[in-house]
Regions:
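A short, N-terminal "cap"/entry segment at the start of jelly-roll beta-barrel domains
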Residues: 1-37
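Ligand-binding loop in jelly-roll beta-barrel domains
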Residues: 83-106
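Short acidic-glycine-tyrosine-enriched beta hairpin
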Residues: 67-84
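Short, conserved beta-strand element in jelly-roll/cupin
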Residues: 39, 48-64
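Short, charged/polar surface micro-motifs in flexible loops or helix N-caps
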Residues: 30-32, 41-43, 59-62, 101-103
Length: 107
């Protein structure tokens, strides 16, 4: 199987006033992995992951708080988060975001 997803096929989800996700590869395509371009311009409330997540920062000047530890990320950095981690963020970023399994699919 293969699937090409064009930019005009993405589905944009408004997570909050300052946080959006342009979803390209979703659980409707495959339950194994999802891919989005996420953007933050401000403060992200704490959340707990139910899946593994990787951020590749296209542009970034952002501080994450991960299980109480501050982690600063810049453009070109990669951040891996294991499932069950509680994290929040403050700053600005645009990132390719990959979830395994696909976002919204329980392990």
């Amino acid at each position: 199987m293969y699937k090409k997803i064009s930019n005009n096929e993405k589905v944009t989800r408004k997570i909050s006033e300052v946080h959006t996700a342009d979803n390209y590869l979703t659980k409707e395509t495959t339950k194994n992995i999802s891919l989005a371009v996420t953007k933050l311009t401000g403060k992200m409330d704490p959340s707990k992951l139910s899946n593994e997540r990787v951020y590749y920062f296209i542009s970034a000047d952002v501080n994450f708080i991960i299980d109480g530890e501050k982690v600063h990320c810049n453009s070109g950095d990669v951040l891996y988060l294991d499932s069950d981690i509680i994290y929040s963020a403050e700053g600005d970023f645009e990132a390719v975001t990959i979830n395994v399994p696909a976002f919204g699919v329980e392990k």
